[in-house]
Amino acid sequence: DAGIYLTASGEEIKKFNARDGLAMSRLNKNGLRVAILSHSKNIDIIRKRADMLGLETWYAGQEKKSLILARWAQEYGIPPESMLYLGDDLNDLDAFRYVGVGVCPADADPLIKKHAALILESKGGEACFRELADRAFRDLLLFEP
């Protein structure tokens, strides 16, 4: 939902969608490399979410997203044109230009929508990853290893 929640003491809290999490976890267990790539400054929250979902591949920081994707492409032997990226804002544009398929939620920035191969019906934070998984990888979601 693009929201950043802060407590009175200044602690950052993030909301994650449980349906997105189930889809990420299942796809990852079934052989698709699912990763989290965030410009969040709160590395601990992203690490904790990745751990909860069993995801080994994640990044939180300010480096250009395309550079992180290039690193992962080399590390895992994945051609960039075989990568799919889900993003919603201007800081995702370089990633959209790097990967083969860019996907965005319904409420993405207009420039991101212009570069997207697919615009989902769901808004960010409202199970848009799950929508993507249901559309593209339904059989893998149903299989529980």
Residue locations for each model-derived region?
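Short, basic/glycine-rich phosphate-binding loops at helix/coil junctions
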Residues: 2-7, 46-53
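Cytosolic catalytic headpiece of P-type ATPases
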Residues: 4, 42, 127-128
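Active-site neighborhood of HAD-like aspartate-dependent phosphohydrolases
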Residues: 1-33
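Short secondary-structure boundary segments
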Residues: 39-40, 62, 106-109
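Feature captures the catalytic cores and cofactor-binding loops of soluble hydro-lyases/lyases
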Residues: 44, 62-66
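Substrate-recognition element of Asp-dependent hydrolases with the DxDx(T/V) motif
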Residues: 24-48, 96
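Mg2+-dependent phosphoryl-transfer enzymes with acidic/Ser/Thr/Gly-rich catalytic loops
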Residues: 10, 17, 52, 57, ...
